Regions:
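N-terminal helix-rich module
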Residues: 2-3, 10-13, 28-58, 62, ...
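Residues within membrane-spanning alpha-helices of integral membrane proteins
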Residues: 20-21
Length: 231
């Protein structure tokens, strides 16, 4: 008599994603109970981002193919402006071809955005000018996500009918990356409709003093960074 076949268990990749999202949700709930507000949202976003990086790295190693983390940097999507600097996806590469279906896609918590890299063009109005502190690092360099490189900007249609601009962070089958550097998160808010011109940023980042993020090593390993002075 044949025994019934049981469904397979979670893969390591799936467990990483689930555990990370549960941890991030816990931070939001605890922060909400304690009145943490934006600080809790930043902590949650940091946990989500680190988990996505680890998941992309693990997936590359498990499949023996490349993966990439994609961050939406397109300010012109009027159909869903909430994707700008908040929507992140993981794609896999099979036989040298990037697969259109994403293995993971998620929005960062509301009110938290990825700070762009040193791109040739950054939409006007993104960085608040109403803060006493400038948008610079401790060494006076611009406060930018150095792991997000201008030469890794692509146009792609991902979970939307629109073709948008994305910046990618790639992982090799060994789990390594050629894009070591920082990925910075900052609090912000959508700008009021009609208050900005086409092509300008639909969101405004609020305060360079309250940021979090991570530093990505060449081995693809994230290290959490909790304040501006540490970037």
């Amino acid at each position: 008599m044949p025994f019934p076949r049981h469904r397979r268990g979670f893969t390591l990749f799936e467990l990483l994603v689930v555990i990370g999202l549960i941890a991030a949700l816990s931070l939001v709930l605890l922060g909400g109970l304690g009145g943490g507000g934006k600080s809790a949202a930043l902590q949650s976003a940091q946990a989500v981002l680190a988990n996505l990086v680890s998941a992309a790295r693990t997936k590359a190693q498990a499949d023996g193919g490349g993966t990439r983390l994609l961050i939406n940097i397109d300010p012109a999507n009027t159909a869903d402006p909430s994707r700008f600097l908040r929507y992140i996806a993981i794609q896999t590469q099979v036989a040298g071809v990037w697969q259109s279906a994403t293995v993971v896609d998620i929005y960062l918590p509301e009110g938290v955005y990825v700070v762009p890299g040193n791109f040739a063009s950054i939409p006007a109005g993104l960085f608040s000018t109403g803060t006493a502190a400038p948008w610079t690092k401790s060494d006076s360099a611009p406060l930018r996500s150095t792991a997000l490189r201008a030469n890794q900007i692509i146009s792609a249609t991902i979970n939307s009918p629109a073709t948008e601009q994305w910046v990618s962070v790639g992982f090799a089958p060994a789990g390594t990356t050629a894009q070591s550097g920082d990925i910075i998160l900052a609090g912000g808010h959508p700008r009021a409709p009609g208050s900005f011109a086409p092509g300008e940023s639909p969101v405004e980042l609020e305060n360079p003093e309250t940021i979090r993020g991570l530093t990505l090593s060449a081995y693809g390993l994230p290290t959490l960074i909790n304040d501006r002075a540490s970037f």
